[in-house]
C-alpha cells in the first residue's frame, strides 16, 4: 500500500451502479468464497500488515480469478472516469470477498494505492455488494454525508482517498466483492 493520492475534483468521487451483477452471479461468488474459507481480515499500515480488531473485525478471503476479473472490468469500464489524466486499465489480480456478520465493521479509513512494476497504479476502489442485510452495514462517506445501503448486485466505485467506513451489521450477513481499478 502506498500513500494517499489527492481526490481528482474533475471526476465524481463516488459512482453507484444498481443491478451491476445478477443475484445468481452474487450467490455463486459467495458459495465459492465460503468454499475457499475466510480468515480474519488484516489492515495494511505503513509499518506493516496486522490484525487490528479495534479498527476492523470482519473476515476476508483473497483469490485470483481471471475470468471474473475480466468480466467485472468489462462491465465497469464504460462507467469509469479518467483520473489525474489517466484512463482505467484493469482490475487488481487479487480479488477479495469480505464477510461482515452482526457487530462487525471497518472504521473510517482511506484506501491506499498500489503501484505495479509496469507503472500503472490503483486509483479507484471497486465494491460489489453480494448480499443485503436486514439492518446496518452501510458504507458511510462522511465528507459526502452519504451512506450506501448494501443491495445485492449493487456496485460502488470511489476514489481511494475518499474517507469511508463500513458501519456495523446489525442483522444479517453482508458479503462484498472488493477490488481496485488500475490506471495508466
Residue spans of the language-model regions?
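Fe(II)/2-oxoglutarate oxygenase catalytic core
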Residues: 1-125, 129-155, 161-184
Amino acid at each position: 500500500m502506498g500513500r494517499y493520492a489527492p481526490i481528482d475534483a474533475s471526476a465524481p468521487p463516488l459512482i453507484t451502479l444498481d443491478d451491476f451483477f445478477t443475484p445468481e452471479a452474487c450467490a455463486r461468488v459467495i458459495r465459492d468464497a465460503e468454499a475457499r474459507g475466510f480468515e480474519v481480515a488484516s489492515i495494511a499500515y505503513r509499518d506493516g500488515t496486522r490484525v487490528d480488531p479495534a479498527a476492523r473485525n470482519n473476515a476476508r478471503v483473497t483469490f485470483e480469478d481471471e475470468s471474473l476479473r475480466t468480466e467485472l472490468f468489462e462491465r465497469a469500464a464504460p462507467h469509469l472516469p479518467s483520473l489525474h489524466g489517466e484512463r482505467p486499465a484493469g482490475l487488481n489480480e487479487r480479488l477479495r470477498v469480505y464477510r461482515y456478520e452482526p457487530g462487525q465493521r471497518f472504521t473510517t479509513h482511506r484506501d491506499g494505492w498500489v503501484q505495479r512494476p509496469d507503472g500503472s497504479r490503483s486509483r479507484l476502489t471497486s465494491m460489489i455488494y453480494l448480499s443485503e442485510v436486514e439492518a446496518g452495514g452501510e458504507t458511510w462517506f462522511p465528507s459526502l454525508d452519504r451512506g450506501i445501503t448494501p443491495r445485492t448486485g449493487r456496485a460502488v466505485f470511489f476514489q481511494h482517498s475518499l474517507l469511508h467506513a463500513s458501519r456495523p451489521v446489525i442483522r444479517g450477513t453482508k458479503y462484498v466483492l472488493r477490488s481496485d481499478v488500475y490506471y495508466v
